[in-house]
Amino acid sequence: MGDALAVSLMQMRGFTSVDFARLHPGGSLGRRLLMTVGNVMRSHDLPVVAPDCSATDMIHAISKGGLGLIIICDGDRIEGIVTDGDVRRAMERRRAEFFNIKAADIATPNPKTISADRKLIEAEKMMTRNKVTSLLVTDAAAPVKLPT
């Protein structure tokens, strides 16, 4: 009964989820609606490798990075990403040839990216819509970062 009264009062006063988030910024709704990707991105110790990275080095970099992926960069240019799933699928398909492949051979080109100033809820929606678990955060000052 109390919930029904609260909802009715909120509707009568035009009280929105954004209003609630502003009054309760520490809650999960407030965090998602008010925080930006820049507030939660990982910008250090990213698992970045060159396009010619070997299969063995890819596995090591994915394990060490702790994110389930590596970022393939040629200088400051993002060439793609390789996930632990990409590595598993390549092992199944290529079997004996697997250890001859390079990162560029199995990389997903044009990974999903987002700007650091976007709201966290936008990043969550984008990840859900694209069925991915990570987004690269790009901007002119720092071309590669990851929301954590």
Locate predicted features.
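Bateman (tandem CBS) regulatory domains
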Residues: L33-L46, N100-P111
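A short, polar/charged loop-to-alpha-helix boundary motif
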Residues: V87-N100
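The conserved cystathionine-beta-synthase
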Residues: V49-G66, M91, T113-T133, V137-A140
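Internal, active-site/partner-interface "lid" segment
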Residues: Q11-R42
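A glycine-centered beta-loop-beta connector
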Residues: V40, I62-G65, I70-D86, M127, ...
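Alpha-helical scaffold segments in soluble metabolic enzymes
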Residues: A4-S8, R22, N39, D57, ...
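Cytosolic regulatory modules rich in charged/polar residues
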Residues: G14, A116-K119, P143-T148
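Short alpha-helices
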Residues: M1-F15
